[in-house]
Amino acid sequence: ISSTISGEMKKDAIVAIAVSSVLMLLYIAFRFSDVKFGVSAVLALVHDVLVVFAAYSIGTLSVGNTFIACMLTIVGYSINATIIIFDRIRENMRTQDSKESLEELVNKSIGQTFTRTIYTSLTTFIMVFVLFVMGVTSLKEFTFTLMLGIVCGAYSSVCITGPLWYTMKKKFSKKNA
C-alpha cells in the first residue's frame, strides 16, 4: 500500500466498503423481494474485488487512489450486469411455465441476457484496451485494472450470481419445507 494512503484513509475505505455492501444487499433484497438476490450479488462483487486485489498483489502494484477509483468503477459495472440478469429472472418467474423447473428458468434467464452482457463487456473492454495501448503512462495502471475488472465482472455476473441465487433458493426452500 502506497505511502500516500494513511492508516485513517485505509480504515475509512474498509468502513465505506462494508457499509455500501450492506446497503446494496438491502436495496437488492428490497427491490427483488428476496434477500438471496442481494447476498449472491454482494458475494459476486467480493469475488470481483478479491480477484483484482490478488492481481495487484501478484504484480506487486501499489494500492493508492487509482486502485480505489478502479474498484468503485468495477463494482458499479459489475452490479449493473448482475441487476440485468436478476431482473430477467424475476420477469421469467412471473411468466414461468408450470413444467419449467427453477434451474431451467435461471439458465434461460442467463441465456437471454448473455449476448447483451458479452457485447457490453466486450465494447467497454475494447475502449479501455485502446486507452491502455495508446494512452499516456499515467493511465496504464488504471486501464489495466479496469480491463481485469471488466472481464471478472462479466464472468461473475453470468457464471456466479444466477447459479448462486438458485443454490441458495433451493437450499433454503428445502429447510423451510
Regions found by a protein language model. Name each.
Residues 1-177:
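A structural signal for conserved, well-ordered secondary-structure elements
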